[in-house]
Curated annotation (Swiss-Prot):
GO terms for biological process: chaperone cofactor-dependent protein refolding. It is found in: Cytoplasm. This is Co-chaperonin GroES. Belongs to the GroES chaperonin family. Heptamer of 7 subunits arranged in a ring. Interacts with the chaperonin GroEL.
């Protein structure tokens, strides 16, 4: 199944959570923090402005992004994978290599 977000929504695949600390301590699943990074897997058509124009999104499929700890409260399961759906305004930055 494919998910197509509407308007200024973005679908993100969260990066894998760290299961080991920098010191080598293995964390149980409940103690590991969910990362605030992920890859954009789908984007909407853009934000509809008050004058009716559509402003395209600044992120694109494949971008690695950083988002806030409480962003993406809408989680959907697609083909057994949990994906986050959030507004573009919840994305803090794009990671450039």
């Amino acid at each position: 199944m494919k998910l197509r977000p509407l308007h200024d929504r973005v679908v993100i695949r969260r990066s894998e959570e760290e299961t080991k600390t920098a010191g080598g301590i293995v964390l149980p699943g409940s103690a590991a923090e969910k990362p605030n990074q992920g890859e954009v897997v789908a984007v909407g058509t853009g934000k509809v402005l008050e004058n009716g124009e559509v402003r395209p999104l600044a992120v694109k499929v494949g971008d690695k992004v950083v988002f806030g700890p409480y962003s993406g409260s809408n989680t959907v399961k697609v083909d057994g994978e949990d994906l986050l759906v959030m507004g573009e305004n919840e994305i803090l930055a794009v990671i450039e290599a």
